[in-house]
Amino acid sequence: MKRVRAHLRIYGRVQGVGFRWSMSREARKLGVHGWVRNLPDGTVEAVIEGDPERVEALIGWAHQGPPLARVTRVEVKWEEPEGLEGFKVVG
């Protein structure tokens, strides 16, 4: 099975709105692996790996986020997969 890795930076009102926990739940539903964390500048960073279609689906979800979020921009950098397993909320 082909596996891809995306490094995301999510901008807007994305902290204090349940973004990380909602993304973790969505990732688990999709079978996507990786992690998500808040950064001091108010953005959210995530690294996600898995089947290309499932990773794209989670990127699509990140453009909306949970109901209280107001996402203004999502930056995506494609990287080489490293074999992450599970999905964690860190930081």
Curated annotation (Swiss-Prot):
Its EC number is 3.6.1.7. It catalyses: an acyl phosphate + H2O = a carboxylate + phosphate + H(+). The active site is at 20, 38. Residues 5-91 form the Acylphosphatase-like domain. It is an enzyme of class 3 (hydrolase). The keyword rRNA processing does not apply. The keyword Kinase does not apply. GO terms for molecular function: acylphosphatase activity. It comes from the Archaea. Keywords: Hydrolase. It holds the Pfam family Acylphosphatase. PANTHER family: ACYLPHOSPHATASE. Belongs to the acylphosphatase family. This is Acylphosphatase. The lineage of its organism: Archaea, Methanobacteriati, Methanobacteriota, Thermococci, Thermococcales. The gene is acyP.
